[in-house]
Amino acid sequence: MARKRVLVADDLAPVLDTVSSLLSQSFDVVDMVSDGRAALEATLKLEPDLVVLDISMPLMSGIEVAEELQRQGNKAKVVFLTVHEDHDILKTCRAAGGLGYVIKVLMDTDLVSAMNEALAGHMFTSRFPSEEQTP
């Protein structure tokens, strides 16, 4: 089976490097970009199976990118990678077509799972570390 093609968008180079390392064993990373406009253009041009989007990026937010992809009928699955532990933002991401919502501090354990779930058409949401109960 062919490896799934993934585009990654985040404005922080260290995050792009980490994501690339996490995905290199299982996915074909077709491009890594650092702003929302580049993410939109690259997704429309390269037609990846899945797009990993940071929410807070220059030029266009990840949410705006996802909304535009949805408007244009693009079939790429969307997973958001974010620092935001916020249920309202999560709802906005879902409305924009996002199937995955991964908190950056959990990307080592959650990102690949979220991507696989999204590719299968299922939703995945990281637990919010700030809501964890302490004994």
Q: What kind of feature is each model-predicted range?
A:
Residues 35-38, 61-64:
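Acidic catalytic/metal-coordinating carboxylates
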Residues 46-52:
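Active-site beta3 strand of CheY-like receiver
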Residues 9-10, 33, 51:
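Conserved sequence signature across two-component system core domains
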Residues 10, 54, 82:
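Active-site residues of response regulator receiver
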Residues 88, 106-119, 123, 127-133:
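C-terminal output helix
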Residues 57:
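Receiver (REC) domain active-site loop signature in two-component systems and cognate sites
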Residues 13-31:
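Two-component/phosphorelay signaling modules centered on CheY-like receiver
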